[in-house]
From Swiss-Prot:
Belongs to the ATPase B chain family. F(1)F(0) ATP synthase produces ATP from ADP in the presence of a proton or sodium gradient. F-type ATPases consist of two structural domains, F(1) containing the extramembraneous catalytic core and F(0) containing the membrane proton channel, linked together by a central stalk and a peripheral stalk. During catalysis, ATP synthesis in the catalytic domain of F(1) is coupled via a rotary mechanism of the central stalk subunits to proton translocation. Component of the F(0) channel, it forms part of the peripheral stalk, linking F(1) to F(0). InterPro entries: ATP_synth_B-like_membr_sf (IPR028987), ATP_synth_b/b'su_bac/chlpt (IPR002146), ATP_synth_F0_bsu_bac (IPR005864), ATP_synthase_B_chain (IPR050059). SUPFAM superfamilies: F1F0 ATP synthase subunit B, membrane domain. This is ATP synthase subunit b. It comes from Hydrogenovibrio crunogenus (strain DSM 25203 / XCL-2). GO terms for cellular component: plasma membrane; proton-transporting ATP synthase complex. GO terms for molecular function: proton-transporting ATP synthase activity, rotational mechanism; proton-transporting ATPase activity, rotational mechanism. F-type ATPases have 2 components, F(1) - the catalytic core - and F(0) - the membrane proton channel. F(1) has five subunits: alpha(3), beta(3), gamma(1), delta(1), epsilon(1). F(0) has three main subunits: a(1), b(2) and c(10-14). The alpha and beta chains form an alternating ring which encloses part of the gamma chain. F(1) is attached to F(0) by a central stalk formed by the gamma and epsilon chains, while a peripheral stalk is formed by the delta and b chains. The lineage of its organism: Bacteria, Pseudomonadati, Pseudomonadota, Gammaproteobacteria, Thiotrichales. Keywords: ATP synthesis, Cell inner membrane, Cell membrane, CF(0), Hydrogen ion transport, Ion transport, Membrane, Transmembrane, Transmembrane helix, Transport.
Length: 156
């Protein structure tokens, strides 16, 4: 095996080719691959972070919705309670008003009955006095007595 100049030139050319590929192509290519790998890792990290934030936001939304439902239920129950109180107050007031009107009507009726009785007593006593005067002024026989009683009954 003899080493001649061609072999030596080929070895030098091969070494220069490797140095050139390493310097010009391999360095930027490996830097480009590292940058790309870093971008992908950052993207995956951001996606994971976004997924976590989405889960937190969904959980907060559920809590807010649950709180809003509880608040709405509370407002509804208070409104129903207040409505029942208003209806009950109205019933009580209506009952009191009806009782007051009924008592006033009863009192007025009793006054009217008392007045009517008093008027009737006065009229009856006037008629009795008038009848007694007629009886005393006349001598009464049975027929005249019956006539006076009938006249008295008709005038009553």
């Amino acid at each position: 095996m003899s080493i001649n100049a061609t072999l030596l030139i080929q070895i030098i050319a091969f070494v220069l080719l490797i140095w050139f590929v390493n310097k010009v192509l391999w360095g930027p290519l490996s830097k480009l691959m590292e940058d790309r790998q870093k971008k992908i890792a950052d993207g995956l990290s951001a996606a994971e972070k976004g997924k976590h934030e989405l889960e937190l936001a969904e959980q907060r939304a559920k809590e807010v919705l649950k709180e809003a439902k509880a608040q709405a239920q509370n407002v509804l129950s208070q409104a129903e309670k207040r409505g029942s109180e208003i209806v009950e107050d109205a019933k009580i007031k209506a009952t009191e008003e009806a009782d007051r009107i009924k008592a006033a009507a009863q009192a007025e009726l009793e006054q009217e009955v008392s007045r009517a009785r008093e008027d009737l007593r006065k009229e009856v006593s006037t008629l009795v006095v008038s009848g007694a005067e007629k009886i005393l002024n006349k001598e009464v026989d049975a027929a005249a007595h019956n006539d006076m009683l009938e006249t008295l009954v008709k005038s009553i």
